[in-house]
Regions:
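Extended, solvent-exposed segments with strong compositional bias
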Residues: 95-116
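Internal, hydrophobic beta-strand segments that form the core of beta-sheet-rich folds
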Residues: 132-144, 207-210
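Low-complexity, Pro/Ser/Thr- and charge-rich linker/hinge segments at domain boundaries
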Residues: 27-28, 157-183
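Ligand-binding face of N-terminal immunoglobulin V-set domains in extracellular IgSF glycoproteins
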Residues: 115-127, 133, 140
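A short beta-turn/strand-edge loop motif at beta-sheet boundaries
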Residues: 64-69, 129-130, 194-202
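Bacterial Sec-dependent N-terminal signal peptides
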Residues: 1-25
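Long, internal scaffold/assembly segments composed of regular secondary structure
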Residues: 205-226
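Contiguous beta-strand segments within globular domains
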Residues: 34-79, 178-192
Length: 226
């Protein structure tokens, strides 16, 4: 019988640390860039997480200068802590070109009080397709202005369902009465599936978010048992 090993974590968390929070937030770096939207699989309510095969990420924004800018993008694979994966070449995680691709879906505003230019990009596309799961940083820059960065988008790509680890999450109510109104306690169980895990503390990174917020995420709670 094949019994999946599991890792159980109790998280009394919930005045949480601010670890690597900036990297996971979408950032607008130019005051003329507005209305940045990042939508996974046509569902605006979801976090920006797509599947390795079949998922689609849509990124759009408006440029209030109403002037044509040759915007391009660069795709960077990142580690669990959102630092660039230095051990990987671009060809290891991207089919096509990870940088230098231009955003060609451009529309000028018509009959609006404020003039703007709308730019839209979808991933994967014919020039750039992710071929490895993990965290990704998408950087948009202006080729007409010395490659000046105007926005950064953080998103994640997951393995197909049959290759994923199993994760179960349960909110508990038996917290101490003195903190029950201010904190939450959750129990997380991670099934290794077909992966060989000999050192969970080093091989597995866990993150628990409250209302999809990275600024108060709980990282790497110590497991109660394995």
């Amino acid at each position: 019988m094949n019994i999946a090993k599991r890792l159980a974590l109790g998280l009394s968390a919930l005045t949480l640390g601010n670890i690597a929070a900036t990297a996971q937030r979408h950032e607008i770096l130019d005051p003329n860039i507005r209305s940045l939207q990042v939508i996974a699989d046509n569902d605006w309510r979801r976090m920006p997480i797509i599947g390795l095969r079949g998922g689609q990420l849509s990124v759009s924004f408006d440029d209030l200068t109403h002037e044509y800018h040759r915007y391009a993008y660069r795709l960077t694979h990142c580690e669990a802590n959102w630092k660039p994966s230095e051990a990987l070449f671009e060809s290891d995680y991207c089919d096509g070109f990870a940088s230098g691709n231009t955003i060609d879906d451009v529309q000028e505003s018509i009959l609006t009080n404020t003039l703007y230019t709308h730019y839209r990009l979808t991933l994967p596309n014919g020039q750039c397709a992710m071929k490895r799961s993990g965290n990704y940083l998408l950087t948009i820059y202006d080729e007409n202005d010395d490659d000046r960065e105007v926005a950064r988008i953080a998103f994640m790509v997951t393995e197909p369902a049959e290759a994923q680890m199993g994760v179960g999450l349960k909110v508990l109510t038996n917290t101490d009465a003195t903190i029950n109104q201010h904190h939450q306690q959750v129990e997380m169980e991670v099934g290794y599936g077909g992966y060989r895990v000999t050192d969970p503390q080093r091989q597995i990174t866990t993150v628990v978010l409250q209302n999809q917020r990275w600024d108060d995420a709980r990282w790497n709670a110590r497991p109660q048992y394995t």
